[in-house]
Design a protein with these regions (language model features):
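Long, charge-rich alpha-helical interaction segments
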Residues: 99-107, 127, 169, 185, ...
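Hydrophobic, ordered structural segments
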Residues: 66-102, 113-115
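Short metal-coordination and nucleic-acid-contact micro-motifs, chiefly zinc-binding Cys/His arrays
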Residues: 20-23, 57-60, 121-124, 159-162
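Cys/His-rich microdomains that often coordinate metals
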Residues: 34, 63, 68-71, 135, ...
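Short recognition patches in nucleic-acid-associated and regulatory proteins
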Residues: 32-55, 133-157
Length: 253
């Protein structure tokens, strides 16, 4: 199946991918994900929460632990309260029905010995309105990376010049590459991506090591080199964690 981006929207995705790979960051894919995440959180606590069709989805899916905190941090207290009230109503009604056995049945059991309530709570734990809003567009970004690598020689050079990737997104790139690339192009992509990951992980590891050295009196007069922000960059490499900019919050109140 052709997973290349469609025209029109494809141009938007290409701009986002180009911008991310042109930026000075430890993982351009994390950078793209963070932008999508910020937009999705703002959307959740923007005017959309008053729309019945959107509220029906947030009522059903709720939020993961990470995005529950981010939605709360928007500081739209009334909006958050309304969303939480109707979501809690939905959960209470669903679980009361399951406790009473009104909707329990074989379809509610993954295993014969698993309570219907457990199946429900596990399913609820695995859904998040914000995550699911991000995921579809994020996959299109990944497809665009492979499409541009295959067809755009300038982008290939930009890809090879980036600072590598976090561990999570490195693994995703290797997993999905064969869906879009074949033969020598696939081999080159894998080789390049492997090198980018290892070389840049070592660079950040060495910066962290120098950060540690600076706490030894033997190195007190030595320059910091690139170590001052090494812990923040290590968090990106190891945990795909990009902190919000200081003073920046999604405020939709």
């Amino acid at each position: 199946r052709d997973r290349s981006p469609s025209r029109g929207l494809g141009d938007v995705y290409k701009r986002q991918v180009n911008d991310a790979f042109s930026s000075d960051c430890e993982c351009p894919i994390c950078s793209m994900y963070k932008a999508l995440e910020d937009d999705a959180v703002s959307y959740t606590m923007g005017p959309s929460y008053m729309e019945d069709d959107i509220r029906a989805v947030t009522d059903k899916k709720g939020f993961c632990q990470k995005h529950l905190k981010k939605v709360y941090d928007c500081e739209n207290r009334l909006g958050f309260a309304l969303v939480m009230k109707t979501h809690l109503d939905r959960v209470i009604n669903d679980i009361e029905s399951l406790q009473d056995g009104k909707v329990a049945g074989k379809s509610m059991f993954k295993k014969a010995d698993k309570p219907a309530v457990t199946t429900y709570t596990e399913r609820l734990e695995g859904t998040c309105f914000v995550c699911e809003r991000i995921d579809n567009t994020f996959q299109r970004y990944l497809d665009t990376i492979f499409h541009m690598y295959k067809h755009d020689s300038d982008f290939r050079e930009k890809y090879k010049a980036c600072k590598g990737f976090c561990t999570k997104h490195y693994g995703i790139l290797l997993e999905q590459a064969a869906n879009s690339l074949k033969g020598d192009m696939l081999d080159e992509f894998i080789k390049t991506t492997n090198s980018l990951y290892i070389e840049n992980m070592k660079r950040v590891r060495d910066d962290v090591e120098w950060f540690i050295n600076k706490f030894d009196h033997k190195y007190i007069d030595e320059p910091w080199k690139n170590a001052k922000d090494s812990l923040v960059r290590a968090m990106i490499k190891d945990g795909s964690y990009i902190a919000d900019e200081p003073g920046k919050r999604n405020n939709t109140r």
